[in-house]
């Protein structure tokens, strides 16, 4: 039972409707859990260092903090932390990105209250409304996840920077930037240019909310 180990939930969900649904779901399962809601995300200070805390976040409503949120998710996963993330049912590209970052528990926000309650009761719960990990991303060991550099370049691309601008910003060669972009597309199975642009556009849409 998850609530026997976790004493605090760090909840990041800017949208009131989904935030209230998440809080209701958590407290219905275990009313003694402390639910902390950060006003803002600070990349330099991860949401928690305590093993008894769990980070839970809605990605689709992150707005201008989407890129900070992606970096925090990546950082926490690389630290071996378990986190819970929810996305919209049909947001296939965002689902792929979450799996590639290494998110183990991905829930469907359309059924958040139902699924989060089940996840709080069972660590092994998986959404019945989202594609499974394996058909989308194979070989999900740590070596095959997005690296820190690749995530930075993905974010730079979503912000509209050219490869030359990224090379200057990140102090690397143009060919290195190109190689990173190719690796990202391969990891996410986005061989078609249109699919790659769709992902960048989706991240920009979230940022512009």
Report residues per predicted region.
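Generic structural marker for isolated residues within well-ordered, non-membrane alpha-helices
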Residues: 23, 163, 181
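N-terminal regulatory/sensing modules of transcriptional regulators
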Residues: 1-133
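Residues within the DNA-recognition helix of helix-turn-helix
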Residues: 119, 180-183
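Basic, Lys/Arg-enriched C-terminal extension of HTH/homeodomain DNA-binding domains
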Residues: 185-209
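Helix-turn-helix DNA-binding segment
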Residues: 136-176
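Residues at alpha-helix boundaries and the short loops/turns that link adjacent helices
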Residues: 110, 160, 187-191
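DNA-binding alpha-helical recognition surfaces that contact promoter or target DNA
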Residues: 24, 155, 168, 179, ...
């Amino acid at each position: 039972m998850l609530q026997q180990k976790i004493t605090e939930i760090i909840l990041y969900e800017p949208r009131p409707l989904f935030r209230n649904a998440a809080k209701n779901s958590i407290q219905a399962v275990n009313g003694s859990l402390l639910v902390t809601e950060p006003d803002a995300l600070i990349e330099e200070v991860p949401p928690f260092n305590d093993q008894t805390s769990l980070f839970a976040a809605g990605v689709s409503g992150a707005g201008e903090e989407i890129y900070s949120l992606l970096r925090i998710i990546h950082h926490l996963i690389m630290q071996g932390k378990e986190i819970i993330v929810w996305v919209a049912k049909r947001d296939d590209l965002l689902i792929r990105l979450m799996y590639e970052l290494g998110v183990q528990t991905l829930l469907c926000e359309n059924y958040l209250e139902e699924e989060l309650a089940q996840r709080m009761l069972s660590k092994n719960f998986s959404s019945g409304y989202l594609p499974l990990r394996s058909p989308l991303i194979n070989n999900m060991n740590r070596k095959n996840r997005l690296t820190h550099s690749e995530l930075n370049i993905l974010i730079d691309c979503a912000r509209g920077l050219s490869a030359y601008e990224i090379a200057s910003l990140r102090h690397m060669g143009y060919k290195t930037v190109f190689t990173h972009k190719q690796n990202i597309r391969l990891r996410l199975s986005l061989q078609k240019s249109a699919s790659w642009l769709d992902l960048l556009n989706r991240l920009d849409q979230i940022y512009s909310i």
